[in-house]
Amino acid sequence: MANIKSAKKRAKQTVVRNARNVAQRSMLRTAVKKVIKALDANDAAGAQAAFAVAQPILDRFSARGLIHKNKAARHKSRLNDRIKALAAA
């Protein structure tokens, strides 16, 4: 255990930030899964609505450094491609 005051503070901050990051990462995964679930159900309107919710979450978390910007771009691109293919079919 840390003895120095600043090290104790850093340890507390790490716990709080870790809890926040876990919750936000879970929210992100849930948003992406909702889009995928709508796509699997062939629900174009539902997928589009879920994507409209997931896209700003991906952007926000990539800007904050929670996920890499390329990962966010890859998710958005692949989901959007699937939505377009479903709408065209």
UniProtKB/Swiss-Prot annotation:
InterPro entries: Ribosomal_bS20, Ribosomal_bS20_sf. GO terms for molecular function: small ribosomal subunit rRNA binding; structural constituent of ribosome. The keyword Ribonucleoprotein applies. It holds the Pfam family Ribosomal_S20p. One of its GO terms (biological process) is translation. The keyword Glycosyltransferase does not apply. One of its GO terms (cellular component) is small ribosomal subunit. It comes from the Bacteria. Keywords: Ribonucleoprotein, Ribosomal protein, RNA-binding, rRNA-binding. Coiled coil: none annotated. NCBIfam families: S20. Binds directly to 16S ribosomal RNA. Belongs to the bacterial ribosomal protein bS20 family. PANTHER family: 30S RIBOSOMAL PROTEIN S20, SMALL RIBOSOMAL SUBUNIT PROTEIN BS20C. This is Small ribosomal subunit protein bS20.
